[in-house]
Amino acid sequence: MVFAAWYLKFAFFVALAFSIIGGSMASSLVLPHASELKGVWQLSDKHQQCDVSLTDQPLPEGSIWSLNGDNDCLAYMFGEVPAGWRPTPDGLTITDEQGSGLAFFANEPDGWFARFADGRELMMKPNKTNKKNE
């Protein structure tokens, strides 16, 4: 009986701690608006680099924004030419025309990184010389 009472108290406090921690973590992430991230970004891997323009113009799908750039370079980087993007609380997702994700870029201190199962890594950085990003 003593063990059961102790176990129930322990389980209660663990559940309480996780609910407090989980609630504060979720509330600390903010979804940026497209206007905060729009502009020309530099996309690169180990072999190639190209400029990508993230716009705040919505695509017909409704929840993604238009993306423009050199189609040959974009097809090389993503395996197909992406059509759009959407912000997330911890990064941004490059999408096809229907909104399916092609790559997720996590916002890290040294840039925005997408890592793929085959070992490839892409990096995006805002182009600081572009007036849209200032």
Curated annotation (Swiss-Prot):
Signal peptide span per the entry?
Answer: 1-26
Indicate where this protein resides in the cell: Periplasm
Major location, coarse class? periplasm
Annotated disulfide bonds: 50-73
Question: Is the Transmembrane helix keyword given for this protein?
Answer: no
Enumerate the GO terms in the molecular function aspect. Answer: metalloendopeptidase inhibitor activity
List, alphabetically, the Gene3D superfamilies matched: 2.40.128.10
Keywords (alphabetical) are: Disulfide bond, Metalloenzyme inhibitor, Metalloprotease inhibitor, Periplasm, Protease inhibitor, Signal
Task: Output the Pfam families linked to this UniProt entry.
Answer: Inh
Which GO cellular component terms, listed alphabetically, does the Swiss-Prot or TrEMBL entry include?
Answer: periplasmic space
Function as written in the Swiss-Prot or TrEMBL entry: Inhibitor of the alkaline protease.
Family assignment?
Answer: Belongs to the protease inhibitor I38 family.
Q: What is this protein called?
A: Alkaline proteinase inhibitor
